[in-house]
Amino acid sequence: MKRGRPAALRCLLLLRAPALLLLLRAAAVQGDCGPLPVVPRAHPASASAGSTSFPENTTVLYTCDQGFVKIPGKPDAVVCISSRWTDIEEFCNRSCEVPPRLPYAILKSAYISKNYFPVDTVVEYECRPGYRKKYPIQSGKITCRDDLTWSTPAEFCEKKQCPNPGELVNGNINVTTDLLLGSQIFFSCDPGYRLTGEASAFCMIKGNAVGWSSSLPTCIKIICPEPPQIENGRIVNEEDTYEYRHVVTYECNKGFVLTGKSHISCIVRDDVGEWSDPPPTCRVKSPPVIPPQKPTTTSAPGTTTTLPTQKPTTVNTAGPEVPTTQRSTTVNVPGTKVPTTQRSTTVNVPGTEVPTTWKSTTVNVPAAGNRPDTRTTIKSTTASEEKDLASGYRTFLYGVGVGVPVIVCSLGLGVYWWIHRTSGQYETYENKESNVICHNLNESDATSEITSSDKLKKTHVYKVDSFACGASNHWLADIAKEDLRRDFSNAQNISSLLQVLGAAQTQ
């Protein structure tokens, strides 16, 4: 009996085991879901994708594989409900990327929110604000191609143009490119004007149109401040306002000298009017300062007397012995010094020159005795070292005044000798050869010559034997007397002139 109980128990246990397993299994899967369904071109996104059992109400999300995009409107998740997964369709497909952004156009509103663009999908653009369609009208559509790229769009829009900005009075508008959307223009004023407002403007979008970012500026005339007044002077033609480039002229009162610029101009610096230079000043006029001067030499031309050409005739006549030959007398008369800052002025006054171009003719007349020739030489007086032309001229006159008496004395001695000689000599000019022949004058070596200076010479010498020709030879004495009378008269005139000048200088 004891051996039979264990066997029976074992059989009973073996019979009850499958039932227990079935009971246990039924209790485990009741309300749970099994493995996730397979979705083409997608895979579960959760980490529990490898699980085989999912509790009730479990939701599993799928994600499209690489290169595919979710088809809009199709579910991409499954839910465990009553031990079953909800149905799911293929929701992933190939698609182009979002259409490109164009600078001149945007997608129409129907395509803006989409992200699924399968092959052969067509989208359409419209012009952006500030642009307009070109004419003839071109298409603004593009297509998703088989290689999942978009077709190249045509540039079917162009920029709108801003209106003409107008004219800037007393200024200029510089258009660098054009007047289309996005362009910029610059404003500037003419010289002498200041710009008030914006210096530039942009062509920008204003609503559905385009316009300038700012209005035209204005150019205002620049005015300089009142010119400064000066002491002891005034402004010539003074005005109320002084504009750009206006010139102001100054002048000084009588007795004053202007120092500085007499003219100043209204200029513009940093859009502000100002004067080009400081005003001048007026100072008291000072006596003029005479600068040192180099010596000035002035030559006063002399008087040249031309006598008719005559041949000299020499007549030998006996007379008393004549005193010995006198030496030349030179008289230097110092000039009067005048205080001055100038250097000395030298005045050279040439003497009177009488041409001596005659050839001498010597005729000898028998005489009681031959006397040695007497030669008298008187040199002219020279005046120099004068300070100016006037003092030089006076010095010259003083020299003449001293020299003329010497000449007169010499002539007096000659006259004395002429009158008292028994056999003498006389100088004159003779043109008539018949007179000489009439008196049978013979050539003789003994001659007498009177020379006034190197500029005044008499070379006609007559030698007469006590005027033996008688009454017919009185012409010799008459000629001699006439010459002496003329020389003495000239000497008296010069002496009188010197006395008058001396009296004037004394005063």
Swiss-Prot record:
TM region positions: none
Domain of life: Eukaryota
Tissue: All the isoforms are widely expressed. GPI and TCS are the major forms, whereas SEC is minor and TCL is only present in trace levels.
GO biological process per UniProt: complement activation, classical pathway; innate immune response; negative regulation of complement activation
Glycosylation sites noted in the Swiss-Prot or TrEMBL record: N57, N93, N174, N442, N493
Residue intervals of the Sushi domain: 32-94, 95-159, 160-221, 222-284
Alphabetical keyword list: Cell membrane, Complement pathway, Disulfide bond, Glycoprotein, GPI-anchor, Immunity, Innate immunity, Lipoprotein, Membrane, Repeat, Secreted, Signal, Sushi
PROSITE patterns referenced in this protein's UniProt entry, alphabetically: SUSHI (PS50923)
CDD domains per record: CCP (cd00033)
Region feature Disordered, mapped onto this chain: 281-356
GO cellular component terms attached to this protein's record: extracellular region; plasma membrane; side of membrane
Compositionally biased residues, Low complexity: 295-317
KW Calcium (keyword) present: no
Intrachain S-S bonds: C33-C80, C64-C92, C96-C144, C127-C157, C162-C203, C189-C219, C224-C266, C252-C282
InterPro entries: Compl-Cell_Adhes-Reg (IPR050350), Sushi/SCR/CCP_sf (IPR035976), Sushi_SCR_CCP_dom (IPR000436)
Amino acid composition bias (Polar residues), ranges on this chain: 323-356
Family affiliation: Belongs to the receptors of complement activation (RCA) family.
Function: This protein recognizes C4b and C3b fragments that condense with cell-surface hydroxyl or amino groups when nascent C4b and C3b are locally generated during C4 and c3 activation. Interaction of daf with cell-associated C4b and C3b polypeptides interferes with their ability to catalyze the conversion of C2 and factor B to enzymatically active C2a and Bb and thereby prevents the formation of C4b2a and C3bBb, the amplification convertases of the complement cascade.
The protein, known as: Complement decay-accelerating factor
